[in-house]
A protein has these predicted regions:
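Glycine-rich catalytic cores of cysteine/serine-nucleophile enzymes that process amide/ester linkages
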Residues: 20-98
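Sec-dependent signal peptide recognition
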Residues: 1-7
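A structural motif
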Residues: 108-121
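Activation targets extended, charge/polar-rich intrinsically disordered C-terminal tails
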Residues: 122-188
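Extracellular structured ligand-interaction cores
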Residues: 23, 41, 54, 103-105, ...
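Boundary of Sec targeting at the N-terminus
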Residues: 16-17
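N-terminal signal peptide c-region/cleavage motif recognized by signal peptidases
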Residues: 11-13
């Protein structure tokens, strides 16, 4: 019911403009011990004190009760969705597991903030929320990145050329460590 109340509040802001006091941040959470937390987590926080709004848009929501969850996760066959949580609740959840949360406020113009806000609201519509999770190409880190990049109208430029000589599997092993069954699943 708590999530429903937040969603109801968000729906009332759908056509609203963010105030000039609004801040949008990229939230980064450190990796955890469970297989689905091994890579860390990212989300987007929208805080507008004028509108009494402080929420996190979280692309890491999934149904853990899905049959064969771990098997589907390592094979990239897990459906995830965008959820909205109050910032205090989001932070509380990570503190429970002793996983630090870092926040980087984005230096956006009012127009860019509004564009990102509208993109988040559009993504939260029922027909847009769900996506087939892929731990390399489509996940809780790539989704916020794409939204931020689009809001900035492709003014993000990177000199990143990748890890030369490393495959995705080799790179992912840095996060999975000695968990052989996770590595075996990734190798499939």
């Amino acid at each position: 019911t708590y999530t429903f109340c937040i969603a109801l509040c968000i729906c009332s802001f759908v056509s609203a403009q963010l105030s000039e006091n609004a801040c949008i941040s990229l939230v980064t959470c450190t990796p955890g011990n469970e297989v689905y937390t091994r890579y860390g987590h990212s989300a987007i926080r929208v805080c507008d004190t004028t509108a009494q709004l402080d929420v996190v848009f979280n692309y890491g929501i999934f149904n853990f009760d899905t049959d064969f969850f771990y098997w589907k996760f390592v094979r990239g066959e897990t459906w995830y969705e965008l959820g909205i949580t109050s910032t205090p609740w989001f932070e509380y959840e990570y503190k429970q597991y002793k996983r630090p949360v870092y926040e980087q406020e984005l230096n956006l113009t009012p127009e860019q903030k509004q564009a990102l806000w509208q993109a988040l609201i559009t993504n939260y519509q029922p027909e847009n929320r769900k996506y087939l999770y892929n731990f390399v190409f489509d996940n809780c880190a790539t989704r916020p990145y794409q939204l931020i990049k689009n809001a900035l109208e492709d003014s993000i430029h990177s000199d990143y050329i990748g890890y030369k000589g490393q495959t995705y599997r080799t790179f992912l092993r840095h996060y999975t460590g000695a968990h052989r069954w996770i590595n075996a699943g990734i190798n499939l």
